[in-house]
Amino acid sequence: MSENPHQANAAQRLIWLRRPPRILVGTDAFVPACETHLIDDAWSELCQRNPKLSDGPVFHVVGVHRDGHGGATIHVARTTYRMNAVRLIGIQSGFVGLGTRAVAHWNGKCLVGLRAANCASYPNQWEFAPAGSVEPDEDAAVGIERELLEECGVQAKSRAIAHAVFFDSVVATWEIAHELAMMQPPDAPPNWEYQKLEMVDAAYVPEPMSACTRQMLEIARRIVGNSVAHDTH
């Protein structure tokens, strides 16, 4: 049974995975729930605030369902990032995003980052780093490995493993949560998206943490608990 992203109950909004989720792209483009000139005007305002914003291709989530044997299927339509960003200043575009996140670990510690003050979502809040949007035509696991290098300056030790899919109701985004073992902790300054990076115990993530990060705490504890013995080998 498909789950409406706005109506699924709390138990349905987290799906544990034993294999990567399937992303099925529909043939119909995303149609916003409001007039396009409102979106364009709001996007122009956001770009004036933060010139680093980019209106790149993203997926809108139409629905999510379990498909048995520890998997999930995510039905999506193509659109661009502005449909997501404008919601943060009150434009009801109807967009439901698809993100990719990681619990990146080394030697029993997790990588967290304090988001920049000009980030579109969760500014000045801590989150598990890295994170980003699932880009069309890029595998979600490959994408989060790329984000680790671009945002944190660290290479992955092995391929990202998808552990769960969950819904962040604050920003209306479905997130694929991955495990990433790192080659080493970050030793370079983070890019503009983070004010700073730290390695912490999964049970002691700094405050204020984002609502999304709070949802990921149990995922992180499972990942780190299962991986401590392997990080230093």
Regions found by a protein language model. Name each.
Residues 198-201:
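Short acidic-hydrophobic, aromatic-tinged amphipathic segments that line or gate anion-handling sites
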Residues 1-125, 132-146, 154-186, 205, ...:
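N-terminal leader/linker segments that precede catalytic domains of diphosphate-processing enzymes
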Residues 151:
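Short alpha-helical functional segments enriched in proximate histidine and acidic residues
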Residues 195:
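Lipid deacylating catalytic domains
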